[in-house]
């Protein structure tokens, strides 16, 4: 018997990746950073590969090394790399590394020297996000340094890449501007004498809506897990995560009873209350107080009062409810339960954050569709 659980449907991940892969001639990198967006990095990676993914993408060196320790041998790109990391371990493990500056390139050269083999690099150009990557004015210097390092046998420039700002808002002019900057940057790559095998720019949203941005490799993340990056569009994706818990306690209270800390909710009639053993330590946003949707007894209800560290309360009115009944916070929506999108709307965030929060806590994660 379980008290609370996050269930992950690995067949949904396989199906989503297969569908995404069929929509483009480009290779596909399934992004499994953030513990697979809360779905479990290694199980999600295996499922994505089953579905036809060619690459895996992560942020950190530790994430990439974990994939290698799990026996995964496909190309892996790691791109969020602070100074001073043991990058030679990544080079030895055959991990591709993202490079955003000349200083970072110098670290990669040293890592290759220590590892005794060239570091495989993807040079990143900042096309407008103002985050990682070399700006268009810095780009020639990075390209010249990379070309020299490659000529010296210290590195191999495998890819050139960037990241969109507004791809989740189809038609936004910034996307076209970024694409133009990327093309400008690619022209400079050629002039520097580099011939990288992979050019990549498309995240989930661009994979789904901008075939002109697919180039040689697409990098879907959220869509792998069945969630849409574009508001109001489902694209036929199948959500992979369900979060639920069993009612811990029920009680009858009179009209006018204050509920949870601060009594921010008061019953307007005699009511049956259900205490659910999930709280902000389990990924339930405290901002879901008096707003988070939950299905219990086939009825959508709203969290009553403040979310606590370990529990919250539902006002069930006259409806019968008993300890052990299942409360579903979100799932696919097929049976009328809330979705991660519903939760994101209720608390003023994005579906990415909802699944990542719920899937990366003390709540046990269980899997359907596991393969031997």
Swiss-Prot record:
GO molecular function, one term: pyridoxal phosphate binding
Protein EC: 5.1.1.1
SUPFAM superfamilies found in the cross-reference section: Alanine racemase C-terminal domain-like, PLP-binding barrel
N6-(pyridoxal phosphate)lysine modified-residue sites: 33
GO cellular component: cytosol
Biological process per Gene Ontology, one example term: D-alanine biosynthetic process
EC main group: isomerase
Signal sequence bounds: none
Pfam families, A to Z: Ala_racemase_C, Ala_racemase_N
CDD domains (alphabetical): PLPDE_III_AR
Cofactor(s) this protein cannot do without: pyridoxal 5'-phosphate
Gene3D superfamilies in UniProt: Alanine racemase, Lyase, Ornithine Decarboxylase, Chain A, domain 1
Family: Belongs to the alanine racemase family.
Protein's name in the database: Alanine racemase
């Amino acid at each position: 018997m379980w008290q609370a659980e996050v269930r992950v449907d690995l067949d949904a991940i396989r199906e989503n990746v297969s569908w995404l892969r069929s929509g483009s001639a480009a290779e596909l990198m399934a992004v499994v950073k953030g513990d697979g967006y809360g779905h479990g990095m290694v199980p999600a990676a295996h499922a994505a590969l089953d579905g036809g993914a060619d690459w895996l993408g992560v942020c950190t060196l530790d994430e990439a090394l974990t994939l290698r320790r799990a026996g995964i041998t496909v190309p892996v790109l790691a791109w969020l790399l602070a100074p001073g990391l043991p990058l030679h371990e990544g080079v030895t493990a055959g991990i591709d590394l993202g490079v955003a500056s000349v200083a970072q390139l110098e670290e990669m050269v040293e890592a290759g020297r220590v590892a005794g083999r060239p570091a495989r690099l993807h040079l990143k150009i900042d096309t407008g996000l103002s985050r990682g990557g070399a700006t268009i004015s810095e780009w020639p210097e990075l390209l010249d340094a990379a070309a020299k390092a490659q000529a010296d046998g210290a590195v191999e420039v495998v890819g050139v890449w960037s990241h969109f700002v507004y791809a989740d808002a189809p038609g936004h002019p910034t996307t076209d501007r970024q694409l133009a900057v990327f093309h400008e940057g690619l022209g400079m790559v050629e002039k520097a004498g580099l011939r990288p095998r992979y050019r990549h720019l498309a995240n989930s949203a661009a994979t789904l809506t901008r075939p002109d941005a697919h180039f040689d490799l697409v990098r879907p993340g959220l869509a792998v897990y069945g969630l849409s990056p574009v508001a109001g569009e489902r694209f036929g994706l199948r959500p992979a995560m369900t979060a639920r818990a069993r009612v811990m306690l029920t009680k009858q209270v009179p009209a006018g009873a204050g509920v949870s800390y601060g009594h921010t909710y008061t019953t307007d009639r005699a009511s049956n209350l259900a205490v659910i053993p999930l709280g902000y330590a389990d990924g339930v946003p405290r901002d879901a107080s008096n707003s988070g949707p939950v299905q219990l007894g086939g009825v959508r209800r709203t969290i009553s009062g403040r979310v606590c560290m370990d529990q919250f309360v539902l006002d069930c009115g006259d409806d019968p409810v008993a300890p052990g009944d299942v409360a579903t916070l979100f799932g696919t929506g097929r049976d009328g339960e809330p979705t991660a999108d519903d939760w994101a709307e209720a608390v003023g965030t994005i579906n990415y954050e909802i699944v990542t929060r719920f899937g990366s806590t003390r709540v046990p994660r269980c899997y359907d569709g596991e393969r031997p």
